[in-house]
Amino acid sequence: MSMIPGERRYQDGQRVRHRTFGEGVVVSSKLTRDDEEVTVAFPDRGVRKLMASLAGLEVRDQPGV
């Protein structure tokens, strides 16, 4: 999925899955110059800061759904 410039793809509270770290919850995300920095809390791996373009995160659900 391509990202629209200036728009965050990940929202606080969103459940995601990472191929190495497993399932986690987005704590925060912020746009950088040309990417999105996503902070995710993984139950067994701690809190990780990931660059969206490299992380390969799979969205599991939307917050509030």
Each language-model region and where it sits:
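Mixed-charge, Lys/Arg-rich low-complexity intrinsically disordered regions
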Residues: M1-R15, P63-G64
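Short coil-to-beta-strand transition motifs
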Residues: R15-E23
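Glycine-centered tight beta-turn/hairpin loop motif at sheet-sheet or coil-to-beta transitions
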Residues: F21, P43-R45
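Short beta-strand-centered aromatic/proline hotspots
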Residues: G22-K30
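Short aromatic-glycine-enriched beta-strand elements
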Residues: R33-T39
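Intrinsically disordered, low-complexity, charged/polar segments
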Residues: R48-V65
